[in-house]
Amino acid sequence: MPASIPRRNIVGKEKKSRILTKPCVIEYEGQIVGYGSKELRVETISCWLARTIIQTKHYSRRFVNNSYLHLGVFSGRDLVGVLQWGYALNPNSGRRVVLETDNRGYMELNRMWLHDDMPRNSESRAISYALKVIRLLYPSVEWVQSFADERCGRAGVVYQASNFDFIGSHESTFYELDGEWYHEITMNAIKRGGQRGVYLRANKERAVVHKFNQYRYIRFLNKRARKRLNTKLFKVQPYPK
């Protein structure tokens, strides 16, 4: 065993997260493009690349048009994940969660995918590094949110490990048709549904209806925003199991 590598940093049968180099800001041609270490870092990538990976790797097989910050997760020279950040499905809904929030005052983690072979805790580290990038590139963002989908069989373990606050859940209806999943908004919103909505409505009788909980998590980036949480609708609660 090389003396230069501490025993605690060696990856064995358990996929233990390791940091062998100090995380730092990553710049390219004088511009901030990411944050992290050689072993794990996030960097901005093109929209088309992020969408391609999400379409092929994410369980939903669908990207979100509202995303405008696309971060690749790298280990060494390998691209091992993608995080897409942007507006909520309804961009103006941020002010309903945190009072006095405009569209540029928050972000939603729309999509996240990380390779299964990555060490344990890699997802929470990637989120942590992404938040540092957001603070640097989008200083007007005061808070971020994301949803854990019950379809994945978990209640948001990754967000709990990333020190997000759990502020409630709601039940959403999904339609399963010909191997594709459709959110209820695709059925109900004529303009937003597009051709997928047209197809779903035309074949509604064949679709299988599912109801799943979606768990809402929020991470405040400053204390002022925390004080403006709309406590009439949301409150910080114990983590769901």
Swiss-Prot record:
Q: Which residues bind Fe cation?
A: 59, 149, 159
Give the main location: host cell
What effect on the protein does mutating residue 58 to A have, as reported in its record? Loss of acetyl CoA-binding
Q: Which cofactor does it need?
A: Fe(2+); Fe(3+)
Q: Which GO terms describe its molecular function?
A: metal ion binding; transferase activity
Q: Which GO terms describe its biological process?
A: symbiont-mediated evasion of host restriction-modification system; symbiont-mediated suppression of host innate immune response
Report the cofactor remark. Mn(2+), Zn(2+), Mg(2+), Ca(2+), Co(2+) and Cu(2+) showed undetectable interaction.
Can you list the disulfide-bonded cysteine pairs? none
What is the annotated signal peptide range for this record? none
Subcellular location field: Host cytoplasm
Task: State the conditions that upregulate or repress this gene.
Answer: Expressed in the late phase of the viral replicative cycle. Mom gene must be expressed very efficiently only at a very late stage in the lytic cycle because its expression is lethal to the host cell. Expression of Mom requires the viral late transcription activator C and the host deoxyadenosine methylase Dam. Dam methylates three viral sites upstream of the mom promoter to prevent binding of the host translational repressor OxyR. If the viral sites are not fully methylated, the host translational repressor OxyR prevents RNAP recruitment by the transactivator C.
Q: What is the effect of changing residue 124 to A?
A: Loss of acetyl CoA-binding
Name a GO CC annotation attached to this entry: host cell cytoplasm
Which reaction does this enzyme catalyse, per its entry? a 2'-deoxyadenosine in DNA + acetyl-CoA + AH2 + NH4(+) + O2 = a N(6)-methylcarbamoyl-2'-deoxyadenosine in DNA + A + CoA + 2 H2O + H(+)
Its keywords, alphabetically, are:
Host cytoplasm, Host-virus interaction, Inhibition of host innate immune response by virus, Iron, Late protein, Metal-binding, Restriction-modification system evasion by virus, Transferase, Viral immunoevasion
The impact of changing residue 149 to A is: Loss of iron-binding
| Function in brief | Iron-binding protein that performs methylcarbamoylation of adenine using acetyl CoA. This chemical modificaltion makes the viral DNA resistant to a variety of host type I and type II restriction enzymes by modifying approximately 15% of DNA adenine residues. The modification called momylation changes adenine for N6-methylcarbamoyl adenine and occurs just before packaging. Target sequences are 5'-(C or G)-A-(Cor G)-N-(C or T)-3'. Also usually modifies adenine residues in the host cellular DNA.
Could you say which protein family the record assigns here?
Belongs to the mulikevirus mom protein family.
The molecule here is called Methylcarbamoylase mom
Gene behind this protein: mom
